[in-house]
């Protein structure tokens, strides 16, 4: 007979294999695509013709999903420190999001999207959704992994607060721990709706979850 731990491990492995195999069939770059699909199916933060920034877009599955959701008239900009080929239709910006030069590149990209034939300045808050599936490679030390994820969330939030329009949305992956409540309170000061969700495509034993932040306050 199988013990409870063995059954749990078997079920988790089966779930992981299901989404990995499905991602290959659906031509997504990773199984993470289904996390965004589920999140957006429930909260509808990405719509046709939207402008979306994908922070830390490698390997590109979230950008793939976002581009399908916004359609031909929408725009998806992916930012990453890794120089990987972007999914079709996604504009890549390579650099560290903590580097002001990277944000300058992002601002210029947004300006060209909206006013390609002028050098006039524009309001940089023109983005409908900022999404982030970033997470440091796990160290195995929970406190350390949590602290690192909080740093990444803070960096992604800075991008969101710089470029999101009023009523825009921010989605961010994090590693659960003691600082969750502090970050959630900070998010509530900037967004009218903040909720934590763990998609079905996430492994049950994983401590990852997502902050879903909707309706940015003016």
From Swiss-Prot:
It is found in: Mitochondrion. GO terms for biological process: mitochondrial large ribosomal subunit assembly; RNA methylation. Belongs to the class I-like SAM-binding methyltransferase superfamily. RNA methyltransferase RlmE family. S-adenosyl-L-methionine-dependent 2'-O-ribose methyltransferase that catalyzes the formation of the 2'-O-methyluridine corresponding to position 2791 in S.cerevisiae 21S mitochondrial large subunit ribosomal RNA (mtLSU rRNA), a universally conserved modification in the peptidyl transferase domain of the mtLSU rRNA. PANTHER family: RIBOSOMAL RNA METHYLTRANSFERASE (PTHR10920), RRNA METHYLTRANSFERASE 2, MITOCHONDRIAL (PTHR10920:SF18). One of its GO terms (molecular function) is rRNA (uridine-2'-O-)-methyltransferase activity. It catalyses: a uridine in 21S rRNA + S-adenosyl-L-methionine = a 2'-O-methyluridine in 21S rRNA + S-adenosyl-L-homocysteine + H(+). Its EC number is 2.1.1.-. Pfam families: FtsJ (PF01728). This is rRNA methyltransferase 2, mitochondrial. Gene3D superfamilies: Vaccinia Virus protein VP39. One of its GO terms (cellular component) is mitochondrion. Keywords: Methyltransferase, Mitochondrion, rRNA processing, S-adenosyl-L-methionine, Transferase, Transit peptide. The active site is at 173 (proton acceptor). S-adenosyl-L-methionine binds at residues 59-62, 80, 96-97, 133. Coiled coil: none annotated. It comes from Schizosaccharomyces pombe (strain 972 / ATCC 24843) (Fission yeast).
């Amino acid at each position: 007979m199988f013990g409870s731990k063995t059954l749990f491990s078997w079920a988790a492995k089966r779930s992981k294999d299901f989404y990995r195999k499905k991602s290959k069939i659906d031509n997504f770059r990773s199984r993470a695509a289904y996390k965004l699909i589920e999140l957006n199916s429930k909260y509808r933060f990405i719509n046709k013709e939207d402008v979306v920034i994908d922070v830390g877009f490698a390997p590109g599955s979230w950008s793939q999903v976002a581009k399908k959701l916004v359609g031909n008239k929408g725009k998806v900009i992916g930012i990453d420190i890794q120089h990987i080929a972007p999914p079709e239709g996604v504009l890549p910006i390579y650099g560290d999001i903590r580097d002001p030069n990277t944000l300058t590149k992002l601002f210029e990209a947004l300006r060209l999207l909206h006013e390609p034939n002028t050098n006039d300045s524009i309001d940089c808050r023109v983005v409908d959704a900022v999404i982030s599936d970033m997470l440091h490679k796990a160290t195995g030390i929970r406190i350390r992994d949590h602290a690192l994820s909080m740093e990444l969330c803070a960096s992604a939030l800075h991008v969101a607060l710089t470029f999101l329009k009023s009523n825009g949305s921010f989605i961010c992956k994090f590693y659960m721990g003691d600082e969750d409540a502090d970050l959630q309170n900070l998010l509530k000061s900037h967004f009218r709706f903040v909720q934590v969700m763990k998609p079905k495509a996430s492994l049950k034993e994983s401590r990852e979850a997502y902050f879903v932040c909707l309706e940015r306050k003016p």
